[in-house]
Amino acid sequence: MLKKIIILFLGMFLLSACTDNFRSYFQRSANNRLVDSKGAKGGKRKPVYNNKYITLAKKNIVEDNLDDDNDDDYDSDSPLRGERIDPVKRNREMYLKMIKRDIARQKAEAGFAESDDDMTLSRANKKVRKDDSDKEKKIQEELNQIKAMLRETKRDISKYTCPNAVVNQNYAPPVTNYEPVNYPPVKNSKPYNNNSKVKQKFILEDDDNGSNACSI
């Protein structure tokens, strides 16, 4: 019996602590969690913004896609007009700072914190290697063109060569403008022997060489 009384008393005590705002007891926290062990600092929770709208606001600021400020509901005769803090300007500056922080973080993560205009040793080496590769590629293309021209020239030359070396009977020597010179006959005490063996040998050799000559 005593145990039941103690349990009932503790239950009433726990329920009495939630009677002021019973619905908010099981409400989700600012971080959209039923049981939130993080997010609280100094007894207060930081406001949770929707990341989708923050990204959209940054994009609009970067693209300069801003709506005009509407001051229709603002009293122009108010003495505090000059001391009013423009919320649009304040939000714009806030998002600009956020964008700058994002850019600095991305550069730090990518390892390019230095300015793009500064020429580093690694970038210079990459540029030199790229230029060298382009020059080698161009030289290789020129060499291929020269080889193709040489092959074509070789084929053209082979068309004018005769494999069996036949003498062309229609060949005529080129005409020159030189006047013929009449030399005096050579005096020889002994007449030529047309039937000599040496002369016949030279005639046969000339005939063999003439049969192997190429026609023009």
Swiss-Prot record:
- Signal keyword on record: yes
**Does this entry carry the keyword Hydrolase?**
no
Q: Which domain of life is it from?
A: Bacteria
The places in or outside the cell where this protein is found are: Cell membrane
Residues with covalent lipid (N-palmitoyl cysteine) sit at: 18
Q: Which residues form the signal peptide?
A: 1-17
Its Gene Ontology cellular component terms are: plasma membrane
According to the record, the segments passing through the membrane are none
Q: Indicate where a lipid (S-diacylglycerol cysteine) is covalently linked.
A: 18
Topology in the lipid bilayer: Lipid-anchor
Positions the record marks as coiled coil are 133-162
Q: Which keywords does UniProt give here?
A: Cell membrane, Coiled coil, Lipoprotein, Membrane, Palmitate, Signal
What's this protein's name? Uncharacterized lipoprotein RC0563
